[in-house]
Amino acid sequence: MNIREETKQMKLASPLLAATAMEKRNEALACIREALNAHKEEIFEANRKDLALARENHVAPAVVKRLTFNEAKLSDVTAELTSLISLPDPIGKVTLDRELDEGLRLTRVTCPIGVIGVIFEARPDALVQISSLCLKSGNCSILKGGKETTYTNRILFSLIHEAAVKAGLPEKCLLQAEQHNEIDELLECHDSVDLLIPRGSNAFVQYIMNHTSIPVLGHADGVCHMYVDKDYDIKKAIPLIIDGKTQYTATCNAVETVLVHRDIAADFLPKLADALREAGVTIRGSEEVSRLIPVEIIPEGESWHKEYLDLILAIKLVDGVDEAISHTNTYGSHHTDCIITENDETARRFMTLVDSAGVYQNASTRFADGFRYGFGAEVGISTSKIHARGPVGLEGLVSYKYKLLGHGQIVGDYASGKKKFHFRDL
């Protein structure tokens, strides 16, 4: 496949998709949902092939978990499609309406970004989420999944593309890239691809950023922190940590490090350790922590910036909220971090000074998700401060354009003083 030629064709199809009515795009999503349910046994069979190959190749259990596409995952993605259909159209929203002068009206209106290339990791359900979000927001998308789920991705893409075209969307609204060398070709398509969204390891995301002039949106990893303040409620703290660590370990919003105020450590840590061990979690910690509970000691000099994606949790003691903030900003990934406290003033300080896309008080980091935010789904979680930040849903996949409606006005009249602007918001 010639990626350059294909993306040029997608660029031509992009305005056609952007101009389709929301009803038509919603119809496509409904057709996709129907197709996934109708062909679920074929999808599961393809996924079993991928899982068998993964085990033959000694892929880590945490990764195998991410590769799985079963009845539960199908239920999740179809629920996300239903939610997405119910959301308002992100295209055509007027965010500014201003009369510059009599008969000269300026509006700012949301519009699709255009052609988006998404290179994602092992999770096959990501293909459904990404393609459906792009279609709803009127964006053409190029999808490159991991080689670990080749069979699953292939059938999912085939069903999604066929359903979208059947519903009346342009043939070139979706493209699947399967070969690894096509990634480098895609990075060079700066004249036809408007945005790249990489999802994967830190090294992979950095590679993408360093080898393209196309704008890149995304995050590298998820080293999420929870800080247990001295004014904590134990009835909240332990369930929050257990949920953040164990509810689904193989995601970027799972908690990896817990910081504990020294004043409560002797009382709190043994209770936390019992709960963690019961949940099957291996505890790593500083030498100071090891004097209070049994842990795997983290050697001095080893970085605290570590994404385990497994039933492993690091614990460190801190003097208070300011040290917790400093540690989180230094060793976290600016993804999602939480303070567990009943002191609202302390919480405000933490939530103001921690430089992350999501900052929570007394809530699990696992809430950092497009579906749980009511976005329908997400194409990923951005730790960038430009354009979109946090879970990127429909709003993060649109830009805007300015429309100026006039009646023959010329700038010369305003430059000479013959006419004057009166700038009135409507």
Give each language-model segment a name:
Residues 97-98, 106-112, 135, 166-170, ...:
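Solvent-exposed alpha-helices and their adjacent loops that cap or buttress functional pockets
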Residues 37, 41, 181-199, 203-207, ...:
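Aldehyde/semialdehyde dehydrogenase
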Residues 70, 101, 105-106, 174-193:
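A structured beta-alpha segment of the ubiquitous adenosine-cofactor-binding alpha/beta core
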Residues 121-125, 129-140, 155, 159-162, ...:
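ALDH superfamily catalytic-core signature
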Residues 1-106, 133:
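N-terminal Rossmann-like NAD(P)+-binding subdomain of aldehyde/semialdehyde dehydrogenases
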Residues 97-139, 146-156:
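Substrate-binding/gating loop at the entrance of the active-site cleft, primarily
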